[in-house]
Amino acid sequence: MSKIRIGIVGYGNLGRGVEAAIQQNPDMELVAVFTRRDPKTVAVKSNVKVLHVDDAQSYKDEIDVMILCGGSATDLPEQGPYFAQYFNTIDSFDTHARIPDYFDAVNAAAEQSGKVAIISVGWDPGLFSLNRLLGEVVLPVGNTYTFWGKGVSQGHSDAIRRIQGVKNAVQYTIPIDEAVNRVRSGENPELSTREKHARECFVVLEEGADPAKVEHEIKTMPNYFDEYDTTVHFISEEELKQNHSGMPHGGFVIRSGKSDEGHKQIIEFSLNLESNPMFTSSALVAYARAAYRLSQNGDKGAKTVFDIPFGLLSPKSPEDLRKELL
């Protein structure tokens, strides 16, 4: 059986993770890595070509699924619709407030090209989204709570790094214990965004940058920081590398509800990740398999995790899944 041919756009933490995840999936092979940098400066671990993104279009017949590994702030809003013109695509667009608009933009391109584009794959959005849905349908009377962390948010760190005057930055999302305990007890509290999480930022400034201006820009950034209590620490590059170079993350989705006669019922799904990008990458690769299969069946357009049957994610046959996992 021929392997699913994968291309990677962007070779940062996520791109490297996708490269590693492909090695764990024998039904797939990496064809090429596409970068905006000078390809000669990008060293990949696999024995594949590294090409400039401008050359990607010429590979439309050699790649079954293109996995887009750029950031959600500025990369994917352009790359998502662009690459869906030529390839089946997977991405991890994670700016929740903008997902409907992003979906529409990608869908327009994918419908026209006849390609399948699965957006916002990963763990949140992604696996957590599925568990929020599952909680709602199984316990229709109740409340859903999502807590993230403690961990490094790639999207938020990336957003800070794009601020003028910022050389490097890492952002931690921290669940507030009091809120978590109230939810787990079945209290069903009404919690504001600010009551559930805090955000802590460690920032290295460019020489001559104004700390007060940078801090204000961070704390007032819409969709990222404006609704949270945010603490900003300015530190040296050396301290950032020494103390904040890991990428742990995790969190949990809790559905707290009542069934007949007022019985308290709680569903909880949790993740504890040593490497956020490596885990997200594994999810992207699994959904690439589904995109390929949908495309083979003549499907097209943008999709989310809500539209993908779980069986399409697995390399196993439906018969094996029924026998082994059901």
From Swiss-Prot:
Reactions listed under catalytic activity: meso-2,6-diaminopimelate + NADP(+) + H2O = (S)-2-amino-6-oxoheptanedioate + NH4(+) + NADPH + H(+)
Organism field: Ureibacillus thermosphaericus
Name of the gene: ddh
Control of this protein's activity: The enzyme is completely inhibited by p-chloromercuribenzoate and HgCl(2) in vitro. Thioglycollate, L-cysteine and Cu(2+) also strongly inhibit the enzyme.
Activity versus pH, per record: Optimum pH is about 10.5. No activity is lost after 30 minutes incubation at pHs between 5.0 and 11.0.
Notes on temperature effects: Optimum temperature is 65 degrees Celsius. Thermostable. No activity is lost after 30 minutes incubation at temperatures below 60 degrees Celsius, while half of the activity is lost after 30 minutes incubation at 65 degrees Celsius.
Assembly mode: Homodimer.
SUPFAM superfamilies reported for this sequence: Glyceraldehyde-3-phosphate dehydrogenase-like, C-terminal domain, NAD(P)-binding Rossmann-fold domains
Biological-process GO terms, alphabetical: diaminopimelate biosynthetic process; lysine biosynthetic process via diaminopimelate
Keywords, sorted A to Z: Amino-acid biosynthesis, Diaminopimelate biosynthesis, Lysine biosynthesis, NADP, Oxidoreductase
Function description: Probably plays a role in lysine biosynthesis.
EC number of this enzyme: 1.4.1.16
List of residues binding NADP(+): 11-14, 35-37, 69-72, 92-94, 121-125
Pfam families: DapB_N, DAPDH_C
GO molecular function list: 4-hydroxy-tetrahydrodipicolinate reductase; diaminopimelate dehydrogenase activity
Top-level taxonomic group: Bacteria
Protein name according to UniProt: Meso-diaminopimelate D-dehydrogenase
Coiled coil (residue ranges): none
Family to which this protein belongs: Belongs to the diaminopimelate dehydrogenase family.
Keyword Magnesium appears in the UniProt entry: no
